[in-house]
Amino acid sequence: MSDYQVLLYYKYTTIDDPETFAKEHLAACKEMELKGRILVATEGINGTVSGTVEATNKYMDYMANDARFADMVFKIDAADAHAFKKMHVRPRAEIVSLSLEEDVNPLEVTGTYLEPSEFREALLDEDTVILDARNDYEFDIGHFRGAVRPDIQNFRELPGWIEDNREQLADKKIVTYCTGGIRCEKFSGWLKTAGFDDVSQLHGGIATYGKNEETKGELWDGQMYVFDERIAVPINQVNPTIVGKDYFDGTPCERYINCANPYCNKQILASVENEKKYLRSCSHDCRVHPANLYTKNLSKEEFTERLQAINESSPEMVQ
């Protein structure tokens, strides 16, 4: 039995004073020795925390004693250690943002909820568009079979992508999904206000689908990206596959790294060997960037040799 747990949760509910709430909530979390990242806004709370089984159970009881969160659903993962290094509780304007001029309130308008078994049926329906509401790098390490991959790097870019592809989506039955459900609550609501009539969402997100006893994560390929030190977790209990591809050579890969150029910081899939070979950088420009955090530890001679090994030159060698 694992000694730790990771809790993923959210709740759209009114929090009148997010700043005061955040300060008091941070103190409570630290007292329970939790670590994680929590966002609070007048529209609700969105969090992931890790801690011992005892501490996380205590936290769930603590939240249940607040009427605003009494029915909040926690997605629980067993863990061997903390999934975060620190504890942060931050007040925000929104707990998830689509950068809309007029925000959508999921308590007033949202897509129809599909339970995991209903969602699996939708996956098998050729007349249904399954739309991934996550970022491109999340999709690349794992997604539902046949799902559409929006070319976005941030959730707030999604409405623009929809408008650019409105013709292909018009009059279609749309079912959307995300990690735990919070993004889809707002996104599906926006779709309805934007003129799409038949809009549904996976209730509880991928995390719930993967733990469902009936679906067991079937028809999910790869792993699910998570925003903590685990990076990705398994979902498909039936016939797991690897869909991630190494950024450098296209071989199967589920290992994410960040480009060592802090001004880029792009997330890419790369093996340990290719991380070393390509100096943990996504491009030549990033490899030779003066702020590169990987190459700054190399001598000038080694840096030059490593570049030459991949048929590249350092800036001073270019005439």
UniProtKB/Swiss-Prot annotation:
Organism classification: Bacteria, Bacillati, Bacillota, Bacilli, Bacillales
EC numbers: 1.14.-.-
Family: Belongs to the TrhO family.
Top-level taxon of the source organism: Bacteria
Keyword terms: Oxidoreductase, tRNA processing
Alphabetical list of Pfam families matching this protein: Rhodanese, Rhodanese_C, UPF0176_N
Protein name: tRNA uridine(34) hydroxylase
Species for this entry: Listeria monocytogenes serovar 1/2a (strain ATCC BAA-679 / EGD-e)
Biological processes, Gene Ontology terms: tRNA modification
